């Protein structure tokens, strides 16, 4: 089922799986919520909607990634998701990137499709609102025009993609189901989501 809209510019997918998962105590990308490592589960979901899908990781993680999946290594050490997004835009800079963190176990195709359907190409990004009304940077469509702003933040040592979104012209929408944006960073949050999935 390919749901790409060919009247729009190309859309690639990026799974953010290069974090160190310090608070969780184990790699969030390899947690299995649905019988498959989460980084692969998200990549397979994105393949329905995107031209190409890549997994973002640190250089030392590359060999552990299944060879059936394409990889983009982080160009910048210790810069978090912002560095990964810049690395993706450097890799292919003439298309938009749908960037999704690997720690959103309740995310589903309906939510992704809704974001894509509401995409606005004349802003730097289309994103969901968090509970407190802020942009959610880790399930966002970043347009090519975002690159200079992200690079500027990187050069200034400001590694928060959310703050880039807060200062820029973006489209922000409400998720059909806010639970799909629930991210899991700690063992306690993991237990909470496991209870929801039962």
Predicted regions mapped to residue ranges:
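Nucleotide and nucleotide-moiety/phosphate-recognizing core
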Residues: 2-158, 163-180, 187-197
């Amino acid at each position: 089922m390919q749901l790409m809209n060919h009247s729009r510019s190309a859309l690639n997918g990026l799974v953010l799986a290069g974090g160190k998962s310090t608070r969780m105590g184990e790699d969030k990308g390899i947690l299995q919520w649905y019988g498959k490592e989460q980084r692969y589960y998200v990549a397979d979901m994105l393949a329905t909607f995107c031209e190409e899908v890549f997994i973002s990781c640190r250089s030392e993680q590359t060999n552990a990634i299944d060879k059936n999946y394409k990889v983009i290594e982080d160009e910048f050490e210790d810069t978090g998701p912002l560095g990964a997004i810049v690395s993706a835009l450097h890799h292919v800079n003439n298309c938009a990137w749908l960037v999704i963190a690997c720690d959103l176990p309740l995310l589903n195709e309906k939510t992704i499709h809704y974001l894509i359907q509401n995409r606005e190409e004349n802003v730097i990004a289309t994103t969901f609102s968090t509970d407190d009304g802020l942009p959610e940077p880790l399930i966002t469509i970043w347009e090519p025009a975002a690159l200079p702003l992200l690079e500027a933040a990187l050069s200034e040592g400001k590694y928060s993609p959310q703050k880039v979104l807060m200062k820029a012209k973006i489209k922000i929408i409400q998720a059909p189901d806010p639970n799909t944006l629930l991210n899991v960073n700690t063992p306690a949050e993991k237990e909470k989501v496991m209870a929801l999935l039962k």
